[in-house]
Amino acid sequence: MADKSGRLLGGCSFVLDEADCSDLEIDSDDESDKENVPNGQDMCNSFDAEFIDNAPLAQGNTLALFQSQVAQAGKQKVNYLKRKLHLESSELGTVGRAVLQPVNHSTPAAKRRLFECSSSENEVSYAASPAAANTQVFRNQNSGSVGGSSGFGSQASVSQSQQNSNLHLQILKSKNSAACKLAVFKFVYAASFCDLTRPFKNDKTTNYQWVAAVFGVSEELFEASKQLLGRSCTYLHATCRAHEKGSVALLLLSFHVAKSRETVTNLLKNLLNLRAEHMMLQPPKLRGVTSAMFWYKMTLSPNTYTWGQLPRWIEQQILITENSSEVLKFDFSHMVQWALDNEMMDESSIAFHYAQMADHDSNARAWLGLSNQAKIVKDVCTMVHHYQRAIMRSMTMSAYVHKMCERVNVTGSWLVIMQFLKFHGIEPIRFVNALRPWLQGVPKKNCLAFIGPPDTGKSLFTNSLMSFLKGKVLNFANSASHFWLAPLTEAKVALIDDATHACLKYCDTYLRNFFDGYSVCIDRKHKNAVQIKAPPMLLTSNIDIQAEEKYSYLKSRVTCFYFNDKCPLNEDGKPLFQITDPDWKSFFERLWQRLELSDQEEEEEGDENGSRGTFICSTRNSNDFT
């Protein structure tokens, strides 16, 4: 309110605009004083007297409010601890039920409740076993399984068939059946299935040995399957353990032939009358001491049925021998000696065949355990090339031919070669007389040329001789490279097959010294050029060198043989003349003296260094010394 001058009067700001004022409430004794006091100030004093109440107030029920707040805070702390520790629920009060509501996950198909309610129809909880600590496994407590509880109490005994059915339902109803089976297996056998096996992703991959974990198997069918599985296995390991959730069987099968996971699954389905979802099949882990000890200890149990001899991969890892300390030690020289004795010159062949020896060779097993296998194979191949090149250079042509003859164990007929030469009108004695200086590397007699039209057997004849003498074949398509002649540094003989005008022109320009049989210099990739004596060479072509005037410098350096008739074929379309390594062996042994090859017994007596003997490059063990 404001006075006539417009000032606000103190203490009247709380008065409502539409406050009711009654003249009856004013005492008659104050009428005389009211005339001397302004109207606005008198109204404010009246409201101040009625609004302010200085009377004492009652405390109210604050203690009950405090107790309810404390109880609610305690409930929240208990709920937090239960959610954190995954404890089972108990009877909750009315206040707690409003807070502890089901928690919905992002996946609508699988719902999980924080706490159980005893009055609910279907009650779901998590398995509290140690094996399932990391895996969530659902169980239905009203299904009648042992250990399950319901609102009416737990059952004391359940039949085995009902246990197996409950285990099947548990596996089928679980969100992750693989995790459910792994958890049950680990709980029953106290070992992880993944530690005993190695994974195969493809069901079509075949293997001789398989590990099978079967859940909910019937005892009668399991006992009957032992005899049936023994017929198709070299080794059978079968055990079955009963559990409150159902029986779990473990099988180690070693078949006569390799089988896929699909085949083994169908076999067990028919024998045990189970579905594929109730099985786990993987091949065993062959290189693990833990896995081998598990299977060995299981065989000692009276509840385990075994048939056949224990697999070798288990014996090797559990048996202790006097050389057990040397098993893991790899000897590089032994691998080089093996590759040299078996004439392994290719990296892929060395790696593949040496890995196959791991079953009976401790050095091969040690090599497989190394992480730098590829580097070792490359180094072995390099060393074998060095040794073979040095051995070949130290041998004469007579010793080399004799070695090639010893390599062939089968006896052939030298008449096949003679008949082939007669078929083309070549006198055998003329070919033998030309072959003698060719083997000796006589200058101007170092190249034999076989000339004729196509399909006359030129390549058949020359390639069979290269196969017997382990010669090198040069391809003129690589002539653009400076290193296309590098194979001659590791060859005793060489062949240029199907030479055209371009090839003959190149030979006439650059390879005259090669055809002469003199020393030549050959460039090698990433290595220094090497000087060697040109090896004897064979040449096949459809062009008559003697009739071409532009090849006049090659005429005196090449001895020509003409194949004019087409090579006959049999009913199967194969050449009628089949010249093999045994045939060439018989040819050289028959004409050894006529070819003027030296006697090997005399060479061995005159060889003081013993180069003809077996070359030993491996280190000796302490047991080798006497």
Swiss-Prot record:
Phosphoserine found at: 90, 106
PROSITE patterns the UniProt entry points to: SF3_HELICASE_1
Binding site for ATP: 452-459
Biased composition (Polar residues): 616-626
Database matches in SUPFAM superfamilies: Origin of replication-binding domain, RBD-like (SSF55464), P-loop containing nucleoside triphosphate hydrolases (SSF52540)
GO (cellular component) term, any one: host cell nucleus
Position of the signal peptide: none
UniProt keywords, alphabetically: ATP-binding, DNA replication, DNA-binding, Early protein, Helicase, Host nucleus, Hydrolase, Isomerase, Isopeptide bond, Nucleotide-binding, Phosphoprotein, Ubl conjugation
Domain called SF3 helicase: residue spans: 412-576
Localization per Swiss-Prot or TrEMBL: Host nucleus
Protein EC: 5.6.2.4
Stretches with biased composition (Acidic residues): 598-608
Positions bearing the Glycyl lysine isopeptide (Lys-Gly) (interchain with G-Cter in SUMO) cross-link: 533
PTM: Phosphorylated.
Reactions catalysed: Couples ATP hydrolysis with the unwinding of duplex DNA by translocating in the 3'-5' direction; ATP + H2O = ADP + phosphate + H(+)
Name recorded for this polypeptide: Replication protein E1
Organism, as annotated: Bovine papillomavirus type 5
Name of encoding gene: E1
